[in-house]
Amino acid sequence: MATVSMRDMLKAGVHFGHQTRYWNPKMKPFIFGARNKVHIINLEKTVPMFNEALAELSKISSRKGKILFVGTKRAASEAVKEAANSCDQFFVNHRWLGGMLTNWKTVRQSIKRLKDLETQSQDGTFDKLTKKEALMRTRELEKLENSLGGIKDMGGLPDALFVIDADHEHIAIKEANNLGIPVFAIVDTNSDPDGVDFVIPGNDDAIRAVSLYLNAVAATVREGRSQDLAAQAEESFVEAE
């Protein structure tokens, strides 16, 4: 299983928190101290907590669980999309629309509209429209793709959320809490860890740190999925005997 060492974390700057004046006192157990008015995260805590989270994500994916990656701030957006795609999972990387999980029925209708528009754009329907109507539909398609493109094939609620920046994505976390969906999140020194089932104390801004988390999670999910496939192959082999 993919694991991350303290050396990897130090190189990526995982230990740099936010300025001390922005801290959330609930993060005190995970803070080592302060340097130049910036909190330093205690990696002695982060390393085992992250590896524990990876072990649990591996279990979920080995049971065919769906993982939803959430990271909508600009620094994380592209990396979140790439990581989710690399392990055939799902993502929200632009704006979290209120009710994305708790109002899944409505979201499903919007996904249907997105897929209809995709078909129309490919089967020549757009070409038969007036220029203005075609432009309006193209804009609608782009808007829906931005918001829902990463979850259009999810086919139902996810089995876990992996969140970059618990503070920024507090609405997503609250919705997952309401539905009993486990939340794995990177929690910086300015964030509230409440509502996060698997807290990973760490820098949520530096792109190197964000990439480190995402690559490790994606590799873990791929491994978990391959365990599931190996188990399936073994079962069918036994049946064939």
Swiss-Prot record:
Gene Ontology process terms (BP): translation
Keyword Ribosomal protein: yes
Single GO MF descriptor: structural constituent of ribosome
UniProt cross-references to Gene3D superfamilies, sorted A to Z: Glucose-6-phosphate isomerase like protein, domain 1 (3.40.50.10490), Helix hairpin bin (1.10.287.610)
GO cellular component, one term: cytosolic small ribosomal subunit
Domain of life the protein comes from: Bacteria
Protein keywords: Ribonucleoprotein, Ribosomal protein
InterPro entries cross-referenced by the UniProt entry: Ribosomal_uS2, Ribosomal_uS2_bac/mit/plastid, Ribosomal_uS2_CS, Ribosomal_uS2_flav_dom_sf
Pfam families hit by this protein: Ribosomal_S2
Family membership noted in the UniProt record: Belongs to the universal ribosomal protein uS2 family.
Name of the protein: Small ribosomal subunit protein uS2
Species annotation: Cronobacter sakazakii (strain ATCC BAA-894)
